[in-house]
Amino acid sequence: MNVTAAEAKKLQDAIKNATDPKGVGYRDFLKAHARSTHSVTPDEKRAPYTCADYLKAHLDPAHQGHGPVGHGYSSANLDAGTQYYAFRISDDVIGISLDTTDAGGHYEGSIGTAQLAWLEKTLKDNKDSYAVVFSHHTSKTMTNTRPDPARPGERRHDGAEVISVLASHGNVLAWVNGHIHKNVITPHKASGGRSFWEISTASHVDYPQLARVIELVDNKDGTLSVFTTLIESAAPHRTDFADLSQTGLAALYRELSYNAPGASKTLAGNADDRNTELVLKKG
């Protein structure tokens, strides 16, 4: 399919500016170019699935792998139609996983009132444990407050409101997220000397394709350290195009990401967004 620069810009602007959350413009775009498209053989393995299907798949013992069952999700999530949950990281650290996807459309996020209230309650109920919060979206990309079609009367809440809740609980150490495909570490201060770190990590799709290991350490001097170590793939830097093994394909994905036309070279972030020791006061 060949499109003009003007058509491509119009489509990209609609996506970026969230002016077409229902995809009407995209539908019209595809219709206008119907003659240059090709039919794809149907395959049930590519069939769209609902949130309920997604949860059921996680709860299916056939997909347990190394576990745990549900990988965080439970039958309670399936019954309530929710995709947020809490889990125990260690005896004195709880993990809280938020669902920041807005089903109302667009790629930016938010959370509903019920989830915000659940977050507040979960932090209060676990006030004697340190808390690490996880989500897909960053605080700055939670700007989409379109109503959830499944809960049309429920208000949506942005990143600033989530920060306000997290900052009001002294047991919150970090908010770990992604979405922006870039390594960024942001401090958040609150009254009473409270603070926490927002740790955003880049994507495996884009160069430099780094993962991050986060470790919590009690320094035994009234402080805690959060280490944010980035790790690199062990795949070769150069590709052997005849090698279709797991290692060979991993090498290919590294080479393709590095040579992607127009790819950003700033996604690794600055030095203070990568391998750091982030210190917090205990208490």
Regions found by a protein language model. Name each.
Residues N2-N126, N183-G283:
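Metal-dependent phosphoesterase/phosphodiesterase active-site architecture
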Residues D102-L116, N126-V176:
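Active-site-proximal segments of metal-dependent phosphoesterases and phosphodiesterases across multiple
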